[in-house]
Amino acid sequence: MGLETEKADVQLFMDDDSYSRHSSVDYADPDKFVDPGSDRDPHRLNSHLKVGFEDVIAEPVSTHSFDKVWICSHALFEMSKYVIYKFLTVFLAIPLAFAAGILFATLSCLHIWIIMPFVKTCLMVLPSVQTIWKSVTDVVIAPLCTSVGRSFSSVSLQLSHD
């Protein structure tokens, strides 16, 4: 149990080139990222995800593990992230994409054929409702408030200290 002063080089070789291209992306500066292949997140919807080893696991200067432990944990982290992600997408991507497609198709249909016609109908009816409401206010509510105000304005209180 001694202090190892040499910095070790960490390299991880994988067969899938597209994965190794994306493992060193600087998410803080999306302009530096130029993907020669197809961009699967063109609108940067998931740019907030930090899944790099250094973003998740960090050892302060005062507490360092052995370099071999650090290298092995880094390699295991990257490999398990790669394998588990691929495994989960094989079984979940197609059913979840199907469910999301059904959900968004249903929401789009409801919005287009029910919600927007209802909103437009309400907006068309509102000017006449506004005219009727103004008439009701002028005929019923304004005289009522005026008479209540006059009644309370004639009340006077006198306090005496006995």
From Swiss-Prot:
Family as reported in the entry's similarity comment? Belongs to the caveolin family.
Post-translational modification summary for this protein: Phosphorylated on serine and tyrosine residues. CAV1 promotes phosphorylation on Ser-23 which then targets the complex to the plasma membrane, lipid rafts and caveolae. Phosphorylation on both Tyr-19 and Tyr-27 is required for insulin-induced 'Ser-727' phosphorylation of STAT3 and its activation. Phosphorylation on Tyr-19 is required for insulin-induced phosphorylation of MAPK1 and DNA binding of STAT3. Tyrosine phosphorylation is induced by both EGF and insulin.
Q: What high-level taxonomic lineage is stated for the organism?
A: Eukaryota, Metazoa, Chordata, Craniata, Vertebrata
Q: What is this protein called?
A: Caveolin-2
Show the GO MF annotations.
D1 dopamine receptor binding; protein heterodimerization activity; protein homodimerization activity; protein kinase binding; protein-macromolecule adaptor activity; scaffold protein binding
Q: What is this protein's gene name?
A: CAV2
Q: Which residues carry this modification: Phosphotyrosine?
A: 19, 27
Localization? Nucleus; Cytoplasm; Golgi apparatus membrane; Cell membrane
How does it associate, per the subunit comment? Monomer or homodimer. Interacts with CAV1; the interaction forms a stable heterooligomeric complex that is required for targeting to lipid rafts and for caveolae formation. Tyrosine phosphorylated forms do not form heterooligomers with the Tyr-19-phosphorylated form existing as a monomer or dimer, and the Tyr-27-form as a monomer only. Interacts (tyrosine phosphorylated form) with the SH2 domain-containing proteins, RASA1, NCK1 and SRC. Interacts (tyrosine phosphorylated form) with INSR, the interaction (Tyr-27-phosphorylated form) is increased on insulin stimulation.
Q: Which InterPro entries match?
A: Caveolin, Caveolin_CS
How does the protein's chain sit in the membrane according to the entry?
Answer: Peripheral membrane protein
Any idea which UniProt keywords this protein has? Cell membrane, Cytoplasm, Golgi apparatus, Membrane, Nucleus, Phosphoprotein
Residues on the membrane's Cytoplasmic side span: 1-86, 108-162
Note whether Transmembrane helix occurs among the keywords.
no
Q: What does this protein do, in the record's words?
A: May act as a scaffolding protein within caveolar membranes. Interacts directly with G-protein alpha subunits and can functionally regulate their activity. Acts as an accessory protein in conjunction with CAV1 in targeting to lipid rafts and driving caveolae formation. Positive regulator of cellular mitogenesis of the MAPK signaling pathway. Required for the insulin-stimulated nuclear translocation and activation of MAPK1 and STAT3, and the subsequent regulation of cell cycle progression.
Alphabetical list of PROSITE patterns matching this protein: CAVEOLIN
GO CC annotations, alphabetized? acrosomal membrane; caveola; caveolar macromolecular signaling complex; focal adhesion; Golgi membrane; nucleus; perinuclear region of cytoplasm; plasma membrane raft
Q: Which Pfam families match?
A: Caveolin
Q: Which domain of life is it from?
A: Eukaryota
